[in-house]
Amino acid sequence: MGLPWYRVHTVVLNDPGRLIAVHIMHTALVAGWAGSMALYELAVFDPSDPVLDPMWRQGMFILPFMTRLGIKESWGGWSITGESAVNPGLWSYEGVAGAHIVFSGLCFLSAIWHWVYWDLEIFSDPRTGKPSLDLPKIFGIHLFLSGVACFGFGAFHVTGLYGPGIWVSDPFGLTGRIQPVSPAWGAEGFDPFVPGGIASHHIAAGLLGIIAGLFHLSVRPPQRLYRGLRMGNIETVLSSSIAAVFFAAFIVAGTMWYGSATTPIELFGPTRYQWDQGYFQQEIDRRVRAGLTEKLSLSEAWSRIPEKLAFYDYIGNNPAKGGLFRAGAMDNGDGIAVGWLGHPIFRDKEGNELFVRRMPTFFETFPVVLVNKEGIVKADVPFRRSESKYSVEQVGVTVEFYGGELNGVSFSDPAIVKKYARRAQLGEIFELDRATLKSDGVFRSSPRGWFTFGHATFALLFFFGHIWHGARTLFRDIFAGIDPELDAQVEFGAFQKLGDPTTKRQVV
């Protein structure tokens, strides 16, 4: 049977046994990849600094998803939150990864069994003796079972009734931890940043799935609907399944890129919009002002800013700064963050405070411009010194650090001031170790960027796949050249033109 590579799936078109076999093998591959990839990430992951070198800076992809579901401890004796782990058992990173690999092996064996023993009695129609599947009934079974799983996840796992809960944090990603979540049944449940909506929506969707599944098990589709939607054709199942997958992929691409309670910044990194809107900068400023109203000095107020919060306010953690074809973790780009140098405050020779204009997301280079509180340019690093009027030297700009490692240190040397002005364009200033990983200094994206790109791309491809297979199943008769209203017996191969008795072949 000489099939081209893009037609090979036709071998399971009318073979339910082997259709099951290839799906079980696909599950084996998915589970095996997940378990193996988790073990690889655990082998290269460094849990020593959850503040300045979290999993998303190290390019971890599987670990954030495991963590948000309630796994936080390793057999290696560490916890994602920094504490030591004591005998975490099966519900640990290694335990769950190993369970996926064992499950993958069992699926592999069952796929082989179903491929060998494909002609099972359960698949044959007793009226015709030919293989046949009751697809509406199978749809009802799957809908019911997925509804039970969905309801169980929301009602037990997320709420902590029987399970650990999920990762919950504050709006600034500082206090994240695993905890049970109560369902949010009011309007707040529709806020994508409210964790309670995860529980309530899974409970509601699960109940809907259970009811819909029971409906499809007990009510047969009308004949006209059955024929109109080609419910007896396995390619209809393929088309609608692809639709469900691409729809889900588009949704999660959005929740990942724009942020939501399901994609906490402590596990996946900040979103680009938090940089664009100065989200963390405003919170830091609010905290400093609050400290000053408590009669703290500027140095004391800045020293109270958590290093974790300051680190979010750094452009190198913006997922939109990494190019799509720059492979590797963020740490391979600008380096491993070692410490916060502190917040630089620039002043002119009259003592007026100046603010460095920050680099927008989609710029690789940006002029160094210092403005006063009214937004008027007062100093810059000129491109042509011969025509400069606002150079650091001419304006007499100085810089002093508050908080961090350089707390209380000031510089008036123009070369040093310009160095820190350039770095202040990128947000809060951090000491970065580029030697350990031979980092090249070019920004990389976080797992948030990679996940979004991958899912948006495949959603688009699957959308076209849905259109393709939907058209094939709806217009199958046209593509095959058979008139669905044809009453006459059509013998394949008897006529040169199918169904046209005037072109009957000559018997030799």
Curated annotation (Swiss-Prot):
**Cofactor, free-text remark:** Binds multiple chlorophylls. PSII binds additional chlorophylls, carotenoids and specific lipids.
- Domain of life (superkingdom): Eukaryota
Q: Which GO terms describe its molecular function?
A: chlorophyll binding; electron transporter, transferring electrons within the cyclic electron transport pathway of photosynthesis activity
- Its topology with respect to the membrane? Multi-pass membrane protein
Cell compartment(s), UniProt: Plastid, Chloroplast thylakoid membrane
Q: Which Gene3D superfamilies match?
A: Photosystem II CP47 reaction center protein (3.10.680.10)
A cellular component term from Gene Ontology for this protein is: photosystem II
Task: Say yes or no: keyword Chaperone present.
Answer: no
Assembly, per entry: PSII is composed of 1 copy each of membrane proteins PsbA, PsbB, PsbC, PsbD, PsbE, PsbF, PsbH, PsbI, PsbJ, PsbK, PsbL, PsbM, PsbT, PsbX, PsbY, PsbZ, Psb30/Ycf12, at least 3 peripheral proteins of the oxygen-evolving complex and a large number of cofactors. It forms dimeric complexes.
Among HAMAP family, the record links this protein to: PSII_PsbB_CP47
The protein depicted here goes by the name Photosystem II CP47 reaction center protein
Protein source organism: Gnetum parvifolium (Small-leaved jointfir)
Highest classification ranks of the organism? Eukaryota, Viridiplantae, Streptophyta, Embryophyta, Tracheophyta
Designated gene of the protein: psbB
